[in-house]
Amino acid sequence: VVGALNKDLPYDEFLRRQIAADLMDLPVREQAALGFLTLGRRYLNKHDLIIADRIDVTFRSSMGLTMQCVRCHDHKSDPLTMKDYYGLYGVFDSTEEVPNGELPVIAPPEDSPGYREFRRELIKRANAAHEYAVARIKNYQRPADPLKFDRKAALSKLNQTERGKYRGLLAKIDELEGKSEFAPARAMAVRDRIKPREPVIFERGQQSSRGPKVPRAFPAFFREEPDRTFRQGSGRLELARELTRQDNPLTARVCANRVWMHVMGRPLVSTPG
């Protein structure tokens, strides 16, 4: 955010990156903007509640619209329906967080304070351990015809349980490396699922009460084309473009109202959120 302000990044471009930087033709470091989606509340990792929060935060922050009401029923005062809500639910349900071991590196590790000294010490200790092991081996008898192990062949002999333990250890190593204070900076990013999920309406907002299917789409009242739905992957990039298109003035007006509030002490419209 600070970098975007310092570069005077246009507000519409700033918003698009917050929602869909991974789907835009941008350097990988720009995926740091996706923290807007990933760093929200977790609700004990309840998937439907995390998605509900992302919908609410996205629309309150950009268009000043509260979307929580239409999760359970059509809005009584705004032109928003449950069909609109679950069309957006499908967008975020078709999006997944990138696992820790695969998070995109947004800055070379050399930029991390103390990284070079850390690497030197790591190499020094690894070499010392290797030299110690070699010296110890010399004290034991060696067969005339040593048996050579092929790593892949050895792994293929493991049963399913052992393979699971092995993968778990590798994942733990990745996790420790990722959490190291000397690890390279990584983006808390999201990505589209391989296969988008087709949303359905949850009757009364209950995930267990599945109603009719709906298309992934922008809320109908604000659409440029009434019948247009999202067809590119999850639909996040299309959503970002709909939020920031020039003939959707609500996004710009909400931003102007908030800027006015911070500069002048009170907003032009009394409900900036």
Regions found by a protein language model. Give the residues of each.
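Short phosphate-engaging motifs
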Residues: 11, 68, 165
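Short, functional "switch" segments adjacent to catalytic/cofactor/reactive centers
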Residues: 22, 99-267
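Extracytoplasmic c-type cytochrome modules immediately beyond a signal peptide or single-pass transmembrane anchor
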Residues: 1-37, 43-44, 171-174, 178-181, ...
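Extracytoplasmic/periplasmic, Sec-exported soluble proteins
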Residues: 7, 28, 46, 50-53, ...
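Active-site-adjacent structural elements in folded domains
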Residues: 53-55, 223-226, 272-273
